Each structure stands twice: as C-alpha cells, then as structure tokens.
C-alpha cells in the first residue's frame, strides 16, 4: 500500500537550533573522544516532535502486528509517530493502514480494537468508509434526509492511506512514502538470521511495560551488553562477559550474537527448534535493532520482538512479543514451557526498567550532557545516536 498526505513541517535548521555545533561535533569524533546525544534530545518535547517529523516519517518502522488483526474485518487503532493510525485487514485479508481520522471534521474513527467490521463509521456525523478506505455515504449531507451515496468516485474524500508492508508477524509503515523498499532496508539484518525459517514461528504471548524514560534509552540498553554482568545475574550466568562481544554495525543495523553451551537453559526446556538448524545454530542467539525502535532476537526455540512506542520525552511503551515454533505456540502440553519463556522475558526486562528510568532522571542534571564512552563496548550505542542524527538531516 502506498501512502500519501504526509509533508514534513520542519527543516535541518530546526535540528541544529536544538543540538548546536558542539554537540554535533562531539557525536562525530572518534569514540574515545566522542559523547552521545545531548540532554535536550531526551528531555525536550520540541526535539521529540522533530524526531517524529524528520526521523520516523522518512523511514520504515513497525506500527503493528499481524496477530492483532488475524481475520478479515479486524481493526486495531495505534499511535505511531505521535499520530492516530488504523491498521485493519480488509475483506480480501489484505493488511491496510490508514490515518485514523474522518475526512469531514477530523474525528478519530476507531478508538478500540474491533472485529467483523463491514464498514467504518465515524462516531461524529456517521460518514462511512469501506475497508479499502473509500468513502461510501454521508448521511444528511445535502440537508435533512438528503443523503450522499458515493459510487466509484476517485475524487471523493476517502481515508488517507499509509504505505505499509508486512514482514512475517510485523507490520512496517513509511509515513512519507519515499523510503527504499522494505526488503532493502531489512537486508543487513536478515543476513544475520537467514538460517532461521521465521514462517515456522507463531505468536505465543506478549509482555507490556510502561517506562518513565525516553525511547532511545530503551534501544541503547537493548543493544549494549556492557551492563549484563551488573544488571542481569541470570543472563550473565547463561553467557558470562568473557564470552560476550560488543555489538557490531552493518550500515543502519546494530547486531550481536553469542554462543551458549546449553541450548535450552533458562528458556523453557523441551520446546521444539526451528527446522533444519545446524549444530552451531542450535547453540546461538542472534539479535539486532533498527534505528527507529524495533529489535528482534532469534534463538533455536523462539523469537522475541522488541517494540518501543514513544509517548512523551520521558515516557515510552515497551512491548515484547514471543513466538514459538509450530504447535508450541498454543498446544496445551507446552503451556509450562510457554509460561517459562514469558516469565523469563518479563523478569529480564524488569531488571532494566529502573536502570533506564534512572538514565532519564540523570539527563535533567547539568553535570551530565553526553558522557564518556567505552571504546570497546559503546560503539553500537554511539552509532545509534549518529544514525538518529543522520536520519534527521
């Protein structure tokens, strides 16, 4: 689906006015001398508005999940880049995304998940739209009992579509409609996980967190393994620091992997593996992040996707979805293992929440404005900052 209707409202000069030359220069230095984005990038509402307008709008990012709209007529309202969108599955089971506003007065069309929809009706004046976004009727539009019925009029004010593509379980959107093809954008990441047949995975559960921190702290923490020994005792026991390496960079993708001795330790013993894995792949965990907040971890027996939605400069919503292989996703005999995996991810992320909330508080201090980085561990978090800046040029 192609999108239309989005126009940038800002310029590079707006970005420079918040950052300043010194902060831009500090980001571009070699890592031993560099510092990350300054405090305003984590605390200033004006900066977050620029991120929406210049970063989110111009690239691909995840706005929804196919398991949330499994059947024709299902619809899910979401907030993405600070605006209301509607994700639905039409009568032909095609996934579509629209701006979730009526073309009459701008009322939000759908405010909660719906099923079995035949038509979309505005709650304000009952303008009705098909699931293809086309305008169908406008009651009393020409006066009392003078209804407007629209038939095959390409100029009728239908819902504004958003460019969208589905990759396995994840619905990616590009608001300005100008990004390269999604396959090209994902290719550096897919090279890291090409031995896993993701089509064999099925949704098994979701874990949610509301976190009083900026979305970038969640992503920086996700790709930075330096904190594991101090923050995650169970994870450190699973793979100690001596076996960990810093995250690597491939264009706009930051990625990592490790090899572990026990393929099922701590992750629900007895779960089926992806088909056709090599011996090495049955003992490997791989993960990556994209600059606009989405991450994916792939293990022999499950997948975890990591999705962060910015809400305010100091608040984000984190959603972790777990996918298991084949019948392990819903068969009763795998219920204990499913719960073990979900609890593991819930507990692991609880260990991070207080830490990344403390980073947000720290960014209100004039004693800190970007920090000093570890040349060994912090290349990927610094690259994320640079990619955010580059995406806003």
Show the residue positions of the predicted features:
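Generic structural "secondary-structure junction" signal
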Residues: 33, 39, 43-44, 57-58, ...
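Rieske [2Fe-2S] iron-sulfur-binding domain
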Residues: 68-176, 183-184, 188
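Glycine-rich, flexible loop/turn motifs
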Residues: 27, 33, 37, 131-134, ...
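Short linear motifs in intrinsically disordered
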Residues: 64-71, 151-155, 283-287, 321
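Short Pro/Gly-enriched beta-strand edge/turn motifs at strand-loop
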Residues: 57-68, 143-148, 287-292
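C-terminal catalytic domain of Rieske-type non-heme iron oxygenases
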Residues: 3-5, 94, 100, 162-166, ...
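N-terminal short leaders/motifs
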Residues: 16-45, 114-126, 155-166, 236-271
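N-terminal pre-ligand scaffold of iron-sulfur
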Residues: 2-112, 162-165
């Amino acid at each position: 689906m192609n999108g239309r209707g989005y126009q940038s409202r800002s310029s590079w000069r707006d970005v420079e006015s918040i950052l300043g030359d010194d902060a831009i220069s500090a980001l571009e230095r070699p890592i031993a001398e560099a510092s990350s984005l300054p405090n305003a990038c984590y605390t200033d509402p004006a900066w977050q508005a620029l991120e929406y307008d210049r970063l989110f709008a111009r690239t691909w990012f995840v706005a929804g999940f196919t398991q949330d709209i499994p059947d024709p007529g299902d619809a899910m309202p979401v907030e993405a880049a600070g605006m209301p969108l509607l994700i639905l599955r039409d009568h032909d089971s095609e996934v579509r995304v629209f701006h979730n506003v009526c073309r009459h007065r701008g009322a939000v069309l759908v405010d909660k998940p719906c099923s079995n929809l035949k038509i979309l009706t505005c709650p304000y004046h009952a303008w009705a739209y098909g699931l293809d976004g086309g305008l169908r009727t406008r009651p009393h539009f020409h006066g009392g009992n003078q209804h407007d019925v629209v038939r095959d009029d390409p100029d009728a004010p239908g819902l504004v579509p958003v460019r969208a593509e589905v990759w396995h379980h994840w619905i990616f959107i590009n608001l300005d409609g100008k990004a390269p093809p999604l396959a090209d954008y994902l290719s550096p990441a897919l090279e890291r996980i090409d031995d896993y047949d993701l089509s064999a995975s099925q949704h098994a559960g979701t874990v949610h967190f509301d976190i009083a921190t900026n979305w970038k702290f969640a992503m920086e923490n996700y790709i930075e393994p330096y904190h594991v020994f101090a923050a995650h005792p169970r994870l450190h026991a699973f793979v100690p620091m001596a076996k960990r390496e810093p995250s690597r960079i491939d264009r706009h993708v930051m990625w990592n992997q490790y090899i572990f001795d026990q393929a099922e330790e701590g992750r629900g013993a007895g779960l089926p593996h992806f088909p056709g894995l090599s011996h090495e792949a049955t003992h490997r965990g791989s993960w990556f992040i994209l600059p606009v907040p989405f991450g994916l971890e792939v293990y022999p027996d499950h997948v975890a996707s990591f999705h962060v939605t910015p809400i305010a400069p100091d608040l984000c919503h984190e959603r972790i979805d777990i996918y298991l292989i084949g019948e392990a996703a819903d068969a009763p005999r795998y219920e204990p293992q499913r719960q073990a995996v979900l609890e593991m991810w819930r507990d692991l992320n609880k260990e991070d929440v207080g830490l990344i909330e403390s980073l947000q508080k720290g960014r209100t201090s004039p004693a800190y404005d970007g920090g000093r980085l570890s040349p060994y561990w912090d290349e990927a978090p610094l690259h994320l900052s640079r990619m955010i800046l580059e995406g806003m040029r």
